[in-house]
Amino acid sequence: MNESRHARLHRATSETDITLALTLDGQGRSDVDSGIGFFDHMLTALAKHGGFDLELKAKGDLHIDGHHTVEDVGIVFGQAFRQAIGDKRGIERFGHALVPLDEALCEAVVDISGRPYLAWNVVFPREKIGTMDTELFEEFFRAFAMSAHIALHLTCKSGTNAHHIAESGFKAVARALKVAVSHDPRSAGAIPSTKGVL
């Protein structure tokens, strides 16, 4: 097991340059700068409600659009999550959360399975929130799930306000991840799988 449950990564391409540090057993502190204001707001909520400490500095080709930056942050965040979780001994593995924000209600279900998958059932009533394209939320969570090697289901059960839907979704994922990475005191450090490996 990675006792510190911490990872620091740097990834540079011709499109983005990203440095990210993640501590799973944190205090919900964050220092985030992606260059996209609303995305920063969502990542801050993810750290706060997941109990993670998150530092992020991303420079991307925002003169084109936000796609490369958002997707690549998802990749690096997923890689850091996978590294920090270590061999998965003693974790709960599964997490589930329903989180409301006024009229919006989102449900997130997580399995730290080693089998990457995203089931996305979220529809936004408008194409942008601030400067961020709402279609990029799916790209972020897909990149995260694929790189973290987790199965993630996110469903919006109700909502009419795009900001509320996005924030409810990020908070639901945060709460589900918080449960999934937590230690099961009855497991005696075992791998949470009948196969003995994840």
Curated annotation (Swiss-Prot):
The keyword Ribonucleoprotein appears for this protein: no
Broad enzyme group: lyase
Tree of life domain: Bacteria
Compartments where located: Cytoplasm
Keyword annotations from UniProtKB, A to Z: Amino-acid biosynthesis, Cytoplasm, Histidine biosynthesis, Lyase
Pathway: Amino-acid biosynthesis; L-histidine biosynthesis; L-histidine from 5-phospho-alpha-D-ribose 1-diphosphate: step 6/9
InterPro entries in the cross-refs: IGPD_sf, ImidazoleglycerolP_deHydtase, ImidazoleglycerP_deHydtase_CS, Ribosomal_Su5_D2-typ_SF
GO CC annotation terms, alphabetical: cytoplasm
GO biological process: L-histidine biosynthetic process
Cell membrane in keyword set: no
EC number: 4.2.1.19
GO function terms (MF aspect): imidazoleglycerol-phosphate dehydratase activity
Swiss-Prot/TrEMBL catalytic activity: D-erythro-1-(imidazol-4-yl)glycerol 3-phosphate = 3-(imidazol-4-yl)-2-oxopropyl phosphate + H2O
PANTHER family: IMIDAZOLEGLYCEROL-PHOSPHATE DEHYDRATASE, IMIDAZOLEGLYCEROL-PHOSPHATE DEHYDRATASE HIS7
Protein name: Imidazoleglycerol-phosphate dehydratase
Annotated organism of origin: Gluconobacter oxydans (strain 621H) (Gluconobacter suboxydans)
